[in-house]
A protein has these predicted regions:
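Bacterial Sec-dependent N-terminal signal peptides
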Residues: 1-24
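Class I SAM-dependent methyltransferase SAM/SAH-binding core
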Residues: 80-134
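A short glycine-rich, Lys/Arg-flanked "PGG" loop and its adjoining helix->strand segment in the class I
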Residues: 158-173
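A short SAM/SAH-binding and catalytic strip from SAM-dependent methyltransferases
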Residues: 143-157
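A short acidic, Gly/Pro-enriched loop at the edge of an enzyme's catalytic core
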Residues: 135-144
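Conserved class I S-adenosyl-L-methionine
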Residues: 175-200
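Core SAM-dependent methyltransferase catalytic element
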Residues: 212-227
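Class I SAM-dependent transferase core
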Residues: 22-72
Length: 227
């Protein structure tokens, strides 16, 4: 399957978010039905999560340079990285000349990223602590809202992404990267994953009407561009 392009008419879509890059925990698979994605992730210490997020093993399947190429020219574009975590994509976007808002609900992640920015002398990343239920975007603030491995952490997604849409410029887009809803070697338990069809249905409720879906670029994840 190359890319599929789907266009829909849509109307309207409160939230919990955090950030994941976990290998499935088979010993605790029985908890999948009751444990939330956020509870599952917070079994791990922040330092362990950062090490995992920034690992060569992640690079191998996340293919960040291919993802950035897929996003196109980001020079001088304002991009919010929702669930920025350790800054995995935020730093790479900044390296390509984007003006990045690295947004996260976690003080630990924000503090770690602040130190990284200072050490590396990065000038084009703004840290933004956000609440669980709001991306804290100003109207028409960004060209791109990027959310990687975090969509499945958000609970009231229709409401949350209607706010994201309001914060995106007229010709801007939302880009979602998350795990296929199947058994793969990385990511959260299958019960925490969200299917492509469900994502599109929820985004339609949030007011999005144009979708580009790529299932070939990454081995374990889909990419959805929405406007």
């Amino acid at each position: 399957m190359a890319k599929l392009y789907l266009t829909f008419l849509g109307t309207l879509l409160t939230c919990v978010l955090a950030f994941s890059q976990h290998k499935p925990d088979q010993k605790n698979a029985s908890k999948d039905s009751t444990e939330t994605a956020n509870e599952y992730m917070h079994r791990s210490h922040t330092d362990d999560l950062i090490e995992r997020f920034e690992s060569p093993e992640r690079d191998a399947y996340q293919k960040p340079e291919k993802v950035l190429d897929y996003l196109g020219n980001v020079l001088n574009k304002k991009i919010m990285d929702i669930g920025a975590g350790s800054g995995y994509f935020s730093v790479k976007l900044a390296d390509r000349g984007a003006k990045v808002i690295a947004a996260d609900v976690s003080d630990e992640f924000q503090n770690a990223l602040k130190k990284r920015i200072e050490v590396q002398g990065i000038k084009n990343i703004e840290l933004r602590k956000i609440p669980y239920d709001d991306p804290n975007l100003h109207d028409h603030e960004v060209d791109i809202a990027l959310i990687v491995n975090t969509y499945h952490h958000i609970e009231d997604r229709s409401t949350y992404f209607s706010k994201v849409k309001k914060g995106t410029k007229g010709k801007g887009e939302l880009v979602i990267i998350d795990f296929f809803k199947t058994e793969v070697p990385v990511g959260p338990p299958t019960g925490h994953k969200i299917s492509i069809d469900q994502v599109i249905a929820e985004l339609k409720e949030a007011g999005y009407s144009q979708f580009e879906v790529n299932v070939d670029l990454l081995p374990y994840q889909y990419i959805i561009k929405a406007k």
